[in-house]
Regions:
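Terminal low-complexity tails and localization/encapsulation signals of metabolic enzymes
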Residues: 1-46, 50-53, 57-73, 83-84, ...
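Rossmann-like NAD(P) dinucleotide-binding subdomain of oxidoreductase/dehydrogenase enzymes
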Residues: 86, 90-93, 112-248
Length: 248
């Protein structure tokens, strides 16, 4: 059991294998997460913009070493991540295990690919600034880790806003990075509701880039509110599939 203590509004997480609410008296919450307010969100964005730890000025070699440590932490904590995904999201061990492997691959891949890009002397590589990562509920390990790792590898400060259904799992992922030495000011975990706080976050003028996976309608709303932001959106689609006589 893990708890983030605060006077703020809390979101409780119960064992998904148990009957739905109302639960029997005395059934404990698996996690209790304090939710960020609109004021908290604004403060987080300011910290990300100010970059007090000077993450943007670190070298790729320094970032690569720290990210390698984060990947190692994720390897060591595979069981904890699988357990949290089951306890909070109801994901089976069979589903979570390969997702963790994919997350580790992401962390290892991005700094390595940047090293290859650095070999092109005609390119000038520089961070974009503040990156907001908003992943979905159904792949709560691999997709957020990929966005966070890519942004950090490039020297950006990151605001990581997990799905409301996976806040505790997002915290466990963030710990893998923090415990490797990546500053909490460079990677901030923002757990907020989908109302005014998240609108403030995604619409904030100091957020330079948004990495979003979710509904097409939501992505279009983000683009409408912040047309000047760099938006990398992976959304749902209704692509046609054509089966010809050549298929088995």
């Amino acid at each position: 059991k893990s708890e983030i203590k605060s006077k703020r509004k809390k979101q409780l997480f119960f064992d998904p294998s148990q009957p739905k609410m109302p639960l029997a008296p005395g059934v404990p919450a698996v996690y209790s997460v304090a939710l960020a307010t609109k004021t908290d969100v604004k403060k987080a964005v300011k910290i990300a913009k100010d970059d007090p730890e000077q993450w943007r000025h670190t070298t790729l070699s320094e970032r690569h070493e720290l990210l390698s440590g984060a990947a190692l932490n994720m390897r060591k904590r595979r069981g904890d991540l699988i357990g949290t995904a089951a306890a909070v999201c109801g994901k089976t061990f069979y589903e979570s295990d390969p997702e963790i492997s994919e997350a580790i691959d992401f962390i290892e891949y991005y700094p390595h690919s940047l090293r290859l890009m650095e070999q092109h002397t005609s390119l000038k590589l520089s961070p974009l600034g503040v990156v907001l990562v908003i992943p979905p509920w159904n792949f709560p390990i691999a997709i957020p880790t990929g966005g966070v790792a890519a942004a950090l590898a490039c020297g950006n400060t990151v605001l990581f806003k997990p799905s409301p259904l996976a806040f505790p799992l997002g915290a466990e992922i963030a710990k893998c990075f923090w415990d490797a030495g990546i500053p909490r000011e460079a990677l901030q975990l923002v757990c907020c509701e989908d109302g005014e706080p998240i609108q403030t976050l995604s619409g904030h003028p100091d957020v330079d880039t948004i990495i979003f996976t979710g509904g097409t309608h939501t992505a279009l709303k983000m683009l409408e509110k912040r047309p000047d932001a760099e938006l990398s959106a992976e959304t749902g689609g209704k692509n046609a599939t054509i089966v010809t006589a050549m298929a088995d």
